[in-house]
């Protein structure tokens, strides 16, 4: 085990092909920056905040010598015929923001909220909009902010 910074990538697998593209973009950015990463899979977007909360509790409980420096949450919600889309998008986004602000975590937000599959595919594609890479870059930048305020070792 090394002591290089680690990022936990939590991926909602409901749209597995979209998740794979998001993660590929993130892993490329993290590898380029020299960050180790670990992947954790959850069923859907609604489960992302709980998984991050569990990881935080585990770090407290086990006093890890190499805790996660940051987290990236990936998933996709595509509008359907009911208001389920609105509830999942709103509640998962709110819960992630609450976790980030209450626990001062570096979080890359990589949840795609799309009207249709074509939008999701173009945003997730590494050779397209590469939203996975963007979420990883956001996480890395927030780690720098934490370092600035001495909330994480340099």
Q: Which residue ranges define each predicted feature?
A:
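Glycine-rich phosphate-binding loop
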Residues: 51-95
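Short, well-ordered secondary-structure micro-motifs
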Residues: 20-21, 49-53, 82-86, 119-123
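Glycine-rich phosphate/diphosphate-binding loop of Rossmann-like nucleotide-binding domains
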Residues: 2-42
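N-terminal beta-loop-helix "entrance" segment that forms/cooperates
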Residues: 39-55
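Proline-centered loop/turn at the N-terminus of a beta-strand
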Residues: 6, 70, 104-108
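Electropositive phosphate-/nucleotide-binding environments in soluble metabolic enzymes
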Residues: 16, 20, 24, 42-46, ...
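Short, ordered loop/turn segments at secondary-structure junctions
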Residues: 13-14, 42, 76-77, 112-117
């Amino acid at each position: 085990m090394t002591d290089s910074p680690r990022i936990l990538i939590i991926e909602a697998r409901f749209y597995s092909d979209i998740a794979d593209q998001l993660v590929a973009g993130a892993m490329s950015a993290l590898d380029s920056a020299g960050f180790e990463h670990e992947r954790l899979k959850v069923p859907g977007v609604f489960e992302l905040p709980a998984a991050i909360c569990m990881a935080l509790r585990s770090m407290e409980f086990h006093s890890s010598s190499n805790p996660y420096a940051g987290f990236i949450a990936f998933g996709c919600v595509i509008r359907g015929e009911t208001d389920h889309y609105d509830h999942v998008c709103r509640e998962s986004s709110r819960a992630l923001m609450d976790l980030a602000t209450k626990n001062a975590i570096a979080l890359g937000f990589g949840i795609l909220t799309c009207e249709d599959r074509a939008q999701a595919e173009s945003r997730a594609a590494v050779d397209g909009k590469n939203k996975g890479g963007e979420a990883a870059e956001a996480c890395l930048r927030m780690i720098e902010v934490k370092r600035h305020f001495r909330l994480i070792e340099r």
